């Protein structure tokens, strides 16, 4: 299986995940819009630098361990290029805006009151079941009562 070539180094993605821990998997449109707006802003690098201290603590610890980077240090030079940030935006939208397929079950409830002559309630229910199974009683759209949906992941 061929893996997709990323537009930036692992270090760049690690930096972005300080601010956006779900950067690579984000699918909420409002969050994606915020990421795109920030990356497209000419003042992006300054904003990222100033806000790193509020970022994900685990990711900040990883940055220190992996790259020796601490809050206040310079961000990767690669992020300073508007062109490079546009590449990130394109990659982000291409991979995260894909529609996903879901299976949804629809359950309709049809109901009809049926009168039948019988010796007792059990026999009445048995006779109605037999008539229903043999298609002597057919429920249709006029018998619709309710519906429900359930999602399967």
UniProtKB/Swiss-Prot annotation:
GO terms for biological process: DNA restriction-modification system. Disulfide bonds: none annotated. Keywords: Restriction system. It holds the Pfam family DpnD-PcfM. It comes from the Bacteria. The keyword Protein transport does not apply. This is Protein DpnD. It comes from Streptococcus pneumoniae serotype 4 (strain ATCC BAA-334 / TIGR4). The gene is dpnD.
């Amino acid at each position: 299986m061929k893996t997709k070539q990323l537009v930036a180094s692992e270090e760049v993605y690690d930096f972005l995940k300080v601010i956006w821990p779900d950067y690579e998997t984000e699918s909420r449109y409002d969050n994606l819009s915020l990421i795109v707006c920030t990356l497209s802003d000419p003042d992006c690098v300054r904003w990222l630098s100033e806000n790193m201290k509020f970022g994900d603590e685990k990711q900040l610890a990883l940055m220190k361990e992996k790259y020796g980077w601490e809050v206040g240090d310079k961000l990767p030079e690669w992020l300073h290029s508007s062109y490079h940030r546009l590449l990130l935006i394109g990659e982000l939208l291409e991979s995260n805006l894909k529609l996903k397929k879901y299976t949804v079950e629809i359950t309709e409830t049809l109901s009809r009151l049926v009168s039948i002559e019988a010796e007792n309630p059990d026999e009445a229910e048995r006779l109605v079941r037999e008539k229903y199974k043999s298609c002597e009683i057919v429920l249709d759209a006029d018998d619709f009562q309710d519906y429900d949906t359930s999602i399967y992941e």
